[in-house]
Structure formats: C-alpha cells, structure tokens
C-alpha cells in the first residue's frame, strides 16, 4: 500500500513538473492527463473510489480533452511560449519560494489550534459537552462511498442539491432561448411553402 502511494505521488509530482517544462503544448496537456490519472490512483488508495471515478470522468473526460482540442486547433508558436516563460520566471520563482515557506510553517506548527488547546479547566468545557456529534465511522464501516455521499446529499444538503439543479435548469433554458431567437433580417428557408408550391408555375423550361 505504501509502495503504491509513493509511486502515484512521485508520478504526480514528476508529471506536474513536466506540464510546465514541456515545450510542446500538446505534450503539456498529455502530462496533465497523467497527473489526473495518478491523483485518481491516490483517491482509490484512500478508499474514495467514487470520487476517483468522478475525477477521471470530469477532468480527463471533459476538461483535459477540451484543452487538448483547443491547443491542437490553435496555432501556438513555441518561441512565443519560451519568451513568455522567461518573462514570468522571476515572479513565479518568488511565489514558489513563498508557498514553500508557508508549507514549512504549517508542517512545523499545529494546523488545528483547538486540538492542542487545553479546555479541561475552561468555560468552553460545558459548551463542548453539550455539542452533538455524529460518528461517521459507524456509517462508513457499513456502507460504501456512494451510499455515504448519497445519504449526505439527500438528507443534510438536499436544499443545496435542489438549488444546483434549478441553476442548471435555468442555464439550459437560457441557452435554448438564446439560440431560438428569431431575427428579422435573417434569411431562412420556408420549408412548408417550398413543399406546397406548384412546381408547374415555378419551374421553367429553357429551350
């Protein structure tokens, strides 16, 4: 298990670095697809098989393929990419150093201060004992990821699920309305009039 984790994580880091180092944009998109596959493998190792499947379907099946088609359709010159890369290299280096510094601070310190806070002799202890917790381990041990996700969506977050469905419905109806608008000066074929007219009057023989 640990061996597979090290393989997937190392391949993810290597592929992610090759995304920005590849000179060909098509190769960059292919390395990005490899990053998504390795990340899905990490999710499978964590027991989140449904999220790994969604990750592959959404990112690899839709977004990465869209990137690949856009890159292949556009005529991107490699010289322009190399010039822009050298132009933004100092800014990217500074941001990378700052991000690495923040990660080192988070590793050295406790990420969740309340876990290391002593509440035994404070006024928070009474409020802490009155809180009601849900033991999700009991549900996860007897169900799969899809069951747990469905239970959460349709019990605790069904309002948000309905709102998201309504937003998608409004977006779909709006796209249909925008495409169905009839312009006055747009020339269209009148199929009914063409099929019902008398061909003897419309067709002329040229001697």
UniProtKB/Swiss-Prot annotation:
Stretches that traverse the bilayer: 1-21, 28-48, 50-70, 88-108, 158-178
One CC-aspect GO term: mitochondrial membrane
Protein name: NADH-ubiquinone oxidoreductase chain 6
GO molecular function, one term: NADH dehydrogenase (ubiquinone) activity
Catalyzed chemical reaction(s): a ubiquinone + NADH + 5 H(+)(in) = a ubiquinol + NAD(+) + 4 H(+)(out)
Lineage: Eukaryota, Viridiplantae, Chlorophyta, core chlorophytes, Trebouxiophyceae
Summary of the function given for this chain in its UniProt record: Core subunit of the mitochondrial membrane respiratory chain NADH dehydrogenase (Complex I) that is believed to belong to the minimal assembly required for catalysis. Complex I functions in the transfer of electrons from NADH to the respiratory chain. The immediate electron acceptor for the enzyme is believed to be ubiquinone.
InterPro entries: NADH_UbQ/plastoQ_OxRdtase_su6, Nuo/plastoQ_OxRdtase_6_NuoJ
Gene symbol of the encoding locus: ND6
Major location category of this protein: mitochondrion
Organism of origin: Prototheca wickerhamii
EC number: 7.1.1.2
Topological type in the membrane: Multi-pass membrane protein
Keywords assigned: Electron transport, Membrane, Mitochondrion, NAD, Respiratory chain, Translocase, Transmembrane, Transmembrane helix, Transport, Ubiquinone
């Amino acid at each position: 298990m640990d061996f597979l984790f090290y393989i997937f994580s190392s391949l993810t880091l290597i592929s992610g670095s090759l995304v920005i180092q590849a000179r060909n944009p098509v190769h960059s998109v292919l390395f990005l697809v490899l990053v998504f596959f390795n990340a899905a493998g990490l999710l499978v190792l964590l027991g989140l098989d449904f999220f790994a499947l969604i990750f592959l379907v959404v990112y690899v099946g839709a977004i990465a393929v869209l990137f690949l088609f856009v890159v292949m359709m556009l005529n991107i010159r490699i010289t322009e990419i190399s010039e822009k890369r050298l132009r933004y290299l100092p800014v990217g280096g500074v941001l990378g150093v700052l991000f690495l510094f923040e990660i080192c601070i988070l590793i050295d310190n406790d990420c969740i201060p309340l876990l290391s806070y002593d509440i035994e002799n404070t006024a928070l202890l009474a409020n802490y004992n009155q809180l009601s917790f849900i033991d999700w381990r009991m549900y996860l041990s007897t169900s799969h990821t899809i069951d747990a996700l469905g239970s959460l969506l349709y019990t605790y977050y069904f309002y948000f699920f309905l709102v998201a469905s309504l937003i998608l419905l409004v977006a779909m109806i709006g796209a249909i309305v925008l495409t169905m608008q009839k312009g006055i000066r747009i020339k269209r074929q009148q199929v009914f009039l063409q099929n019902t007219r008398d061909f003897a009057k419309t067709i002329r023989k040229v001697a």
